């Protein structure tokens, strides 16, 4: 391809599935690698001489180097020049990322500081009651209420809503993001484009989780979502954490001292694949590990719990009729 800028863009598309619309050589670009609003996980820089560039995705952990010519055709000097440019770009990217992480940490620390512990009858406890957790008290302490959290869709503020807020925490105890579930005052899901959202990260998210409970007697369970993890805990008594997505379930780093792992998998392709990946890692580390999956395709354990909670009420109505 004669146009090196277009060739670089084509390589980014092939590697990430997304690319910036405009690439200006010599400048760092951030761009979306998903359909999520405000996603800037992708990054790239084409060098001024147009002979090379770097690109990747912070969320996926991808870091690639591109050369306009086949590496085997480069002279030793050209290889040295490319390596020098890659090193300079890497240093610049890492500095930018550290600053972005620091900015994100400051923003979500402010949000967390505005949250309050749950009390019966607040929007979060009403929401969880609707999800089948009525009568469960105390609820996990990491779940908090924000009384009026702004909701942004792109650059548009759609309003403020009560929200269930939970920290995403690394194995060494660092909070790297906040998970938010937007609600109404009576505990319904808010009428917003995405009810559940993650803040910008303050560090790598891979392997982190929402620590609803700590391990007990060397045993811990994990599920994708908060409600799914809580359903697994309520049904089995196994203390659970939430991975917040299938990809992070597969990459989860269990705490030191864990000897038995229970995976409450979602009954879909992504859920099964993530559970299988985590189980393979756990077994390789000589942990006891079992995967529990709902029998209904597409269901998760929160769905199973909700259906079980509805069954007695339906039976009572039939008896009254």
Kindly give the residue locations of the regions a language model identified.
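Phosphate-handling DNA/RNA-contact segment within nucleic-acid enzymes
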Residues: 152-256
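Non-catalytic accessory segments of DNA primases and related replication-initiation nucleases
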Residues: 1-130, 269, 273, 290
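Short secondary-structure capping/junction motifs at helix and strand boundaries
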Residues: 117-122, 134-142, 176
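Residues at alpha-helix termini
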Residues: 15, 130-134, 234-235, 284
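TOPRIM fold recognition
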Residues: 1-5, 64-67, 188, 217-221, ...
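Short, basic/aromatic recognition patches
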Residues: 134-159
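Short, solvent-exposed polar/charged micro-motifs at secondary-structure junctions
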Residues: 29-39, 147-155, 299-304
């Amino acid at each position: 391809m004669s146009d090196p800028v277009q060739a670089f863009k084509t390589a980014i598309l092939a590697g990430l599935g997304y690319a910036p619309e405009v690439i200006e050589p010599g400048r760092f670009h951030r761009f979306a690698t998903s359909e999520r609003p405000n996603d800037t996980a992708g990054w790239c820089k084409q060098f001024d001489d147009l002979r090379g560039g770097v690109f990747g995705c912070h969320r996926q952990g991808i870091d690639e180097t591109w050369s306009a010519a086949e590496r085997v055709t480069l002279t030793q000097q050209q290889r040295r020049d490319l390596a020098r440019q890659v090193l300079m770009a890497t240093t610049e990217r890492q500095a930018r990322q550290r600053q972005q992480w620091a900015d994100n940490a400051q923003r979500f620390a402010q949000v967390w500081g505005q949250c309050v512990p749950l009390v019966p009858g607040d929007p979060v406890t009403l929401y969880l009651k609707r999800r089948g957790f009525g009568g469960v008290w105390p609820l996990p302490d990491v779940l908090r209420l924000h009384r009026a959290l702004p909701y942004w869709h792109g650059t548009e503020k759609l309003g403020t809503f009560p929200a269930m807020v939970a920290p995403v925490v690394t194995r060494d105890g660092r909070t790297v993001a906040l998970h938010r579930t937007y609600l109404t005052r009576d505990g319904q899901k808010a009428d917003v484009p995405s009810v559940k959202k993650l803040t910008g990260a303050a560090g790598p998210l891979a392997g982190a989780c929402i620590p609803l409970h700590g391990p007990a007697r060397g045993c811990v369970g994990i599920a994708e979502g908060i409600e799914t993890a809580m359903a697994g805990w309520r049904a089995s008594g196994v203390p659970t954490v939430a991975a917040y997505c299938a990809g992070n379930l597969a990459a989860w780093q269990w705490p030191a001292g864990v000897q038995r792992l229970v995976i409450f998998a979602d009954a879909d392709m992504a859920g099964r694949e993530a559970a299988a990946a985590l189980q393979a890692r756990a077994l390789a580390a000589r942990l006891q590990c079992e995967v529990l999956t709902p029998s209904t395709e597409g269901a998760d354990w929160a769905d199973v719990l909700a259906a079980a909670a509805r069954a007695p009420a339906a039976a009572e109505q039939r008896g009254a009729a």
